[in-house]
Regions:
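Surface-exposed molecular-recognition determinants
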Residues: 1-106
């Protein structure tokens, strides 16, 4: 039997799926812990958006994107905060577009 030093991986990494509303703020819960890194991607929708990454070292008001080789970028309405069971997003289309766009968060 394989050995893993992590008994319960979902205590450290979890995936959530949510539907955008376009309304800010939108709380995303059910993660099970306060994330240190949030990776969000529009999963279902007619427009394609880059993967958007934020971490607690840079702070929620900065992001990295996977479609650019640029440095971190200031973000004012993407990720708004982290909570004990998830995170809160603003109304930016990268993270919360209305019309039933579906997003995946890691």
């Amino acid at each position: 039997m394989a050995y893993s030093p992590i008994n319960k991986g979902s205590s450290f990494q979890n995936n959530v799926r949510y539907v955008g509303t376009g309304n800010s703020p939108l709380a995303i819960t059910g993660v099970g812990f306060e994330p240190d890194l949030t990776w969000i991607k529009k999963w279902i929708g007619s427009t394609n958006e880059a993967h958007m990454l934020s971490d607690q070292v840079r702070g929620y008001n900065y992001r990295l994107t996977t479609t650019s080789n640029a440095e971190q970028q200031a973000a004012s309405n993407d990720l708004l905060s982290w909570q004990s069971d998830g995170f809160t997003v603003g109304s930016d289309n990268r993270v919360n577009q209305s019309s039933s766009y579906t997003y995946a968060g890691w």
